Structure formats: structure tokens, C-alpha cells
């Protein structure tokens, strides 16, 4: 039975929204956090295992130094205080994807704490998100529930477990309760998680592909009658794996909780699940406080000591951060805020920058990646990066246009050839013998034929009405297979009209 919902505008006027996010980022190390097992997305199930990742008796964990360095870099990017001494703890719970029956995480002594991230919203407003901690932990295995209607455990015939992911290093970034967002809570949440994605990619510490599960978020939402009232009971929607899903989860939970509070009903402290098909959250298990997990220091791991000298080494390796990079490129390329936002929304900044580095002008690169190539990616249901065309290819097409060897139509056909796997732009041009027709004799013959086929258009042109000029130019382009130079065609047409 569908839950009662309050209108979103009414809910955010009547109640003060408080939300929080726990963002799990899988680190792109070569091996797991506490053992030398290799990490590979989509590999054969249960092939990348060691006694440590299976939790076999007598196996002892050894920390992955690269994972620690990645955590330090992320802490620096999030303006965190980096602890000189931090500690791993056992988080105890029973579930089939956790063969040890505990997760190695950090509890009261995390590596990174007390940070913040400034996120820019659609209208240019900057909102500061407070960060409680960014701690290191290992991931669980992956359950696949077979036989049910929607892939969930309810209604499944049986479950399969792949332990390849067990032990993969994660950083969990936990915000403090985020207050003052009001009706912009979903937008702020989406902008924040996108900013985290951009930062970890810039640091080159994670692929951060939500569709592959190496970045996901738990979404906490509660309501209270006013900003000075105590926090309300929160729900926690687990493992939301899309930016849109995070935004929709917050919006739905605000509406659901507001309707329950209005009816005098209790808000349960529970875990919930976001259902993409129905665009709703569904209740899971009741959730108590962290004490349920019986955290205690892991006796197999000594405390982690990070010296000030090592932190300085990591600082020296920090790249330009995404926000500073965006502002620099916006200035270099002469873009408006709206134009830069279009690039970011299309996830095309890296591709456009690489195209410019390969020799194209920014305007031309932006035209291709946000236009023809975005349409192609949407039609195929893939990302721009997954298209079989490189920034160097796009730059080569732009150079062919600039040198006068291709017009816009031939350039489009060349790009289509590259996408079909016919080779590089130069190879496609040679294969199809694409070239601009500059022979005035051939152009004049095509114009004469177009005039003869469209006498009414010719009369309008001669009377000074230039609106139907496109009919003649289009006919000439069709006759020359798009190879005529548009400027040359226009010149011939104007000469014949005036003559």
C-alpha cells in the first residue's frame, strides 16, 4: 500500500529539514586493504581471495600503505584535521557478505575528522557542508538475490555471494547533520556528492563510478517543527547509487515523514531502500544506535601513526582541486556560468579540456561534446567517455574544418564514420573521399539546377526576400553530397540574382 505523502512545498514550509550523508568511496588501489588480493571490477566471482579476505582462522591483516596515503589526500581536500594517531576497530555484525562476522573500520579514532566542503549550487550560491569524519574501512562482499521480482532478498529463492569485493579499501565520508538547507536539501545533497566524485577523481584515488558500485551513499533524513527544536527521528536509506536517486530519496522522505507527523504517527528509526522503478523508499529493518555493533579496537592491528612530515609530503603531491580548475578553465575559455554548468552537467569537462590540449579551440570542442556526441551517447545509453571517439579525434576534425578541408556537414559525416569504427578522422575522410567542392563550374551547374527546380523561390530572392535562400543552398548541398563550400554557393547564388 502506497504511503501518504505531503506536497513538497508544504512539507518544507511546515517542518525544518535536517539531513546527512554517508558517502562510501572505493579506492582504486591495486590490492585490498589488509591483504595482497588483486582488485578487479566484474571479474570471475570468488577468484580474488586470500585467507584474510575470507576471515580464516590464524590469518592476520597488514595495512595497505597506498590506501592510507589516499585517505590523507582526501582529508586534505576536505579540510579535515588529520590525526597523528588513528585506530582500526571491529564493527561486529552477522551477514553472509561479511565472512569474518565483523568489518574492520574506524570508530572513535578516525584518520580524518572535523572538515568541510563548499559546494556550488545551480544559481551560484555556495553552501558549506560540515564533515564529521572520513575514515578508512574495508568493503563487504556482494550478495545477489536470485528468483525474486526486483533483485531484493524479499521473495528470492536463494542468494549467491561473491567475496571478490570483500576487503576492498573504502573511505566513508560522514557529514555532520546538515541544517539550514530548507527546500534546497535535495539540490545540496546532489551537488555535494558530485563534488566528492570530482575531488576523488582529481586526486586519482577512485574511479567513483556509481553505476559500478564503487561510490554509493546512505541518506539520512529527519524533520523537526523548527530550527531550535531537537532533532527528529531519522530514517536511513542505504546504498543509493545515483545522484538523481540521492536527490529523489531526500525529497520523498521529506514528503513521507511530513505526512506521518501531520497524522500524529511515529517516525521509525529504520533503514530503508530506494526503489528506482517506483521512485519510493521502502522500509527495511529497525535500526538502533552504533552500540549495536559492539565496536572495539582490532587487536591484530597496531595504531596508525601519521607524522607531520608525511602529511607535508602528501600536501606537496596535491593536484589542482576541481573548483579551482573550473574557475581557471571558465576564464581561459571565456565561458559564462551557464555554459560551464552545461559542461559539468554533461560530465564533459575532462573531455573538452583534452580536446583543447590536442589543438582544438574551446568553442569547437564544446560544440561537439555537448551536441552531436551527447546525443549519440544518450541514444546508446552510455557515457561520453564510453563512446568510440577520443578527444584527439575531435581535435583532428576541428583542424580539418579550420584548414578548409571539411565543412560542417562533412565534419558531421566524418565523426559518424569514426563512431562506426571506420578509423581515425583522416582515414574516414580518405575512405569516403570527403572534400569541399570549390570548382565554380560544378557549383554553378548545381545552382542552375536548383533555380530551375524552384522558380518560385528564385522570384522571391530576386524581389529581395532572402528568407528562402536556404532552399537553394540545401538543394546545392544535396546535389554535391554536402561537399560544396557554403560561402562559395552563396556567392554564386547572389551573383545570379543580381545579374
Swiss-Prot record:
GO BP: any one term: glutaminyl-tRNAGln biosynthesis via transamidation
InterPro entries: Asn/Gln-tRNA_amidoTrfase_suB/E, Asn/Gln-tRNA_Trfase_suB/E_cat, Asn/Gln_amidotransferase, Asn/Gln_tRNA_amidoTrase-B-like, GatB, GatB_C_1, GatB_Yqey_C_2, Gln-tRNA_amidoTrfase_suB_CS
One Gene Ontology term of the molecular function aspect: glutaminyl-tRNA synthase (glutamine-hydrolyzing) activity
Catalyzed chemical reaction(s): L-glutamyl-tRNA(Gln) + L-glutamine + ATP + H2O = L-glutaminyl-tRNA(Gln) + L-glutamate + ADP + phosphate + H(+); L-aspartyl-tRNA(Asn) + L-glutamine + ATP + H2O = L-asparaginyl-tRNA(Asn) + L-glutamate + ADP + phosphate + 2 H(+)
Keywords: ATP-binding, Ligase, Nucleotide-binding, Protein biosynthesis
Presence of the UniProt keyword Protein biosynthesis in the record: yes
UniProt-listed Pfam families: GatB_N, GatB_Yqey
First-tier enzyme category under EC: ligase
SUPFAM superfamilies membership: GatB/YqeY motif, Glutamine synthetase/guanido kinase
The EC number(s) this enzyme carries: 6.3.5.-
Entry keyword annotation includes Ligase: yes
Oligomeric form and interacting partners: Heterotrimer of A, B and C subunits.
Family: Belongs to the GatB/GatE family. GatB subfamily.
Role according to the record: Allows the formation of correctly charged Asn-tRNA(Asn) or Gln-tRNA(Gln) through the transamidation of misacylated Asp-tRNA(Asn) or Glu-tRNA(Gln) in organisms which lack either or both of asparaginyl-tRNA or glutaminyl-tRNA synthetases. The reaction takes place in the presence of glutamine and ATP through an activated phospho-Asp-tRNA(Asn) or phospho-Glu-tRNA(Gln).
Protein name: Aspartyl/glutamyl-tRNA(Asn/Gln) amidotransferase subunit B
Organism of provenance: Bifidobacterium longum (strain NCC 2705)
Amino acid at each position: 500500500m502506497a504511503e501518504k505523502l505531503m506536497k513538497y512545498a508544504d512539507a518544507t514550509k511546515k517542518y525544518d529539514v535536517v539531513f546527512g550523508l554517508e558517502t562510501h568511496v572505493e579506492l582504486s588501489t591495486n590490492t585490498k586493504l589488509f591483504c595482497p588480493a588483486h582488485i578487479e571490477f566484474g571479474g570471475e566471482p570468488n577468484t580474488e581471495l586470500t585467507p584474510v579476505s575470507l576471515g580464516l582462522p590464524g590469518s592476520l591483516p597488514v595495512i595497505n600503505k597506498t590506501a592510507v596515503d589516499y585517505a590523507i589526500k582526501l582529508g586534505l581536500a576536505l579540510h579535515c584535521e588529520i590525526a597523528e594517531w588513528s585506530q582500526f576497530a571491529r564493527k561486529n555484525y552477522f551477514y553472509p557478505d561479511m565472512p569474518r562476522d565483523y568489518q574492520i573500520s574506524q570508530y572513535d579514532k578516525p584518520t580524518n575528522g572535523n572538515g568541510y566542503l563548499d559546494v556550488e549550487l545551480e544559481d551560484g550560491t555556495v553552501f558549506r557542508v560540515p564533515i564529521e569524519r572520513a575514515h578508512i574501512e574495508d568493503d563487504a562482499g556482494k550478495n545477489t538475490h536470485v528468483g525474486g521480482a526486483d533483485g531484493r532478498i524479499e521473495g528470492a529463492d536463494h542468494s549467491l555471494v561473491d567475496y571478490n569485493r570483500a576487503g576492498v579499501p573504502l573511505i566513508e565520508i560522514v557529514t555532520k547533520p546538515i541544517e539550514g538547507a530548507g527546500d534546497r536539501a535535495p539540490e545540496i545533497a546532489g551537488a555535494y556528492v558530485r563534488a566528492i566524485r570530482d575531488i576523488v577523481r582529481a586526486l586519482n584515488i577512485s574511479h567513483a563510478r556509481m553505476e559500478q558500485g564503487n561510490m554509493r551513499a546512505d541518506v539520512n533524513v529527519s524533520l523537526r517543527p523548527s530550527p531550535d527544536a531537537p532533532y527528529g527521528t531519522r530514517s536511513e536509506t542505504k546504498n543509493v547509487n545515483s545522484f538523481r536517486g540521492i536527490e529523489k530519496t531526500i525529497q520523498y522522505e521529506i514528503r513521507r515523514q511530513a505526512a506521518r507527523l501531520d497524522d500524529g504517527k511515529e517516525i521509525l528509526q529504520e533503514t530503508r531502500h530506494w526503489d528506482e522503478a517506483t521512485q519510493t523508499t521502502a522500509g527495511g529493518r529497525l535500526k538502533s544506535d552504533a552500540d549495536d555493533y559492539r565496536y572495539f579496537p582490532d587487536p591484530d592491528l597496531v595504531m596508525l601513526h601519521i607524522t607531520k612530515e608525511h602529511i607535508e609530503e602528501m600536501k606537496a603531491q596535491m593536484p589542482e582541486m576541481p573548483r579551482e580548475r573550473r574557475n581557471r578553465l571558465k576564464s581561459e575559455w571565456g565561458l559564462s556560468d551557464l555554459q560551464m554548468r552545461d559542461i559539468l552537467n554533461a560530465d564533459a569537462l575532462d573531455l573538452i579540456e583534452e580536446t583543447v590540449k590536442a589543438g582544438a579551440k574551446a568553442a569547437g570542442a564544446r560544440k561537439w561534446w555537448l551536441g552531436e556526441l551527447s546525443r549519440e551517447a544518450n541514444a546508446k545509453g552510455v557515457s561520453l567517455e564510453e563512446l568510440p571517439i577520443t578527444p584527439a579525434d575531435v581535435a583532428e576534425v576541428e583542424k580539418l574544418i579550420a584548414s578548409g578541408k571539411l565543412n560542417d556537414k562533412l565534419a558531421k559525416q566524418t565523426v559518424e564514420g569514426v563512431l562506426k569504427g571506420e578509423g581515425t578522422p583522416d582515414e574516414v575522410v580518405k575512405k569516403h573521399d570527403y572534400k569541399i567542392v570549390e570548382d565554380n563550374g560544378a557549383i554553378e551547374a548545381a545552382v542552375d539546377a536548383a533555380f530551375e527546380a524552384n522558380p518560385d523561390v528564385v522570384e522571391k530572392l530576386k524581389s529581395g526576400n532572402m528568407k528562402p535562400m536556404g532552399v537553394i543552398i540545401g538543394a546545392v548541398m544535396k546535389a554535391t553530397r554536402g561537399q560544396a563550400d557554403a560561402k562559395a554557393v552563396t556567392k554564386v547564388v547572389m551573383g545570379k540574382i543580381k545579374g
